[in-house]
């Protein structure tokens, strides 16, 4: 609630409250420019990677076929197992007969060959190798069937409610098998989790890597954008005939990172073009507004009953950085939720109320307010002195 009997309610435009460092906003790429290509893809999404705020979306909950984007989940589970210490990048992995038989995009693993686990992860993430992805799954959990079960469990943990994995590679299914299914929104949730692992971004942004002691080169399936789009960190491509051309990507400039998702593009060129437009829309129209503590000209305080002071000043417990367009910044409202009065004694840095940041009726952020110093309970002598002062003031 934004109002109650014990809280003061204010609607204050943020520019009057905070010192803001603002660069000129450009509108080179508008939402309309992004939407003009919507007939060329099945779903799209753009999000701020830090806050998770979705800035643009189109059919984001529609069922789609991820194709090789399933390898994002393979990578996530493998990285989580690596970080737990249960496996190591230096582990030796013997290629199974099953892994060697997987077709499609591959690095031509042969049964009985031995690779470092790191090499197989690189082949999976950089080159989207289906055979390497199976070998990774088998090493991590013993078999791809057990691994697929874990993929679906992890998807549910992340809230990927429209996702169902049936493979570790994303290839079109054989007779009697089912297609992997997901949604742009679910893949956004997966991408948010993946970027918490710097090693994944190091691999996915690698354009070219040697394999088999330099006799084979792993070319990133997103190599064109990695080379030509400033800040592109890669992530993962996917394609088969029914899926269309898919790309989940992340790009970072000047500390600002966006996640872009294009699903079902008609060809790789259109996939790259719409990805550029999405990312341009983010970089050109949004920026981080630094709402740095509370401005010196504006102060909040709470009344203190029975204290040596009648009021105690309050400060925000943290700086607030919000990604906004210039127009959104003008509409931003800040609502202090402060108790009318609190009883003494009051501790230093005691939490008393909150600041709420609202945009178009939606709560974007809430931070606690705390006292700047302690207020002791009023002593008998102080209370008597105060009473005498008040009495003398009435004569």
Regions inferred by a protein language model and the residue ranges of each:
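Domain-terminus/edge residues, biased toward the C-terminal soluble/receptor-binding domains
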Residues: 160, 175-395
């Amino acid at each position: 609630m934004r109002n109650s009997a014990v809280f003061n309610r204010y609607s204050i435009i943020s520019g009057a409250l905070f010192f803001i460092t603002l660069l000129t906003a450009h509108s080179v790429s508008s939402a309309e420019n992004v939407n003009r290509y919507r007939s060329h893809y099945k779903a799209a999404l753009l999000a701020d990677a830090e806050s998770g705020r979705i800035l643009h979306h189109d059919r984001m909950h529609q069922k789609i076929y991820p194709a090789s984007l399933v390898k994002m989940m393979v990578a996530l589970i493998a990285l989580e197992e690596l970080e737990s210490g249960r496996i190591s990048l230096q582990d030796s992995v013997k290629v199974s007969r099953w892994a060697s038989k997987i077709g499609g995009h591959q690095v031509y693993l042969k049964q009985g060959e031995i690779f470092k686990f790191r090499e197989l992860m690189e082949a999976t993430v950089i080159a989207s190798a289906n055979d390497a992805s199976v070998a990774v799954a088998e090493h991590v959990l013993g078999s791809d069937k057990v691994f697929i079960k874990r993929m679906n469990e992890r998807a549910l943990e992340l809230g990927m409610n429209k996702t169902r994995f049936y493979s570790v590679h994303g290839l079109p299914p054989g007779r009697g098998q089912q297609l992997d299914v997901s949604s742009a929104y679910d893949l956004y949730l997966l991408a948010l989790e993946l970027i918490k692992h710097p090693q994944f971004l190091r691999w996915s942004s690698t354009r070219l890597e040697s394999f088999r002691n330099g006799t084979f080169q792993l070319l990133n399936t997103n190599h064109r954008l990695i080379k030509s789009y400033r800040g592109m960190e890669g992530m993962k491509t996917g394609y088969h005939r029914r899926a269309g051309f898919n790309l989940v990507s992340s790009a970072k400039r000047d500390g600002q990172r966006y996640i872009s998702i294009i699903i079902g593009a008609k060809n790789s060129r259109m996939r790259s073009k719409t990805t550029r437009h999405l990312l341009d829309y983010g970089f050109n129209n949004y920026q981080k507004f630094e709402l740095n503590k509370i401005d010196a000209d504006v102060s909040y305080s709470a009344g203190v009953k029975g204290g040596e002071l009648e009021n105690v000043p309050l400060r925000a417990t943290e700086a607030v950085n919000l990604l906004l367009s210039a127009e959104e910044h003008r509409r931003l409202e800040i609502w202090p939720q402060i108790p009318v009065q609190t009883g003494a004694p009051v501790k230093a840095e005691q939490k008393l109320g909150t600041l709420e940041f609202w945009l178009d009726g939606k709560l974007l952020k809430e931070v606690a307010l705390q006292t700047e110093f302690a207020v002791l309970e009023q002593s008998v002598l102080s209370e008597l002195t105060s009473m005498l002062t008040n009495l003398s003031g009435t004569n």
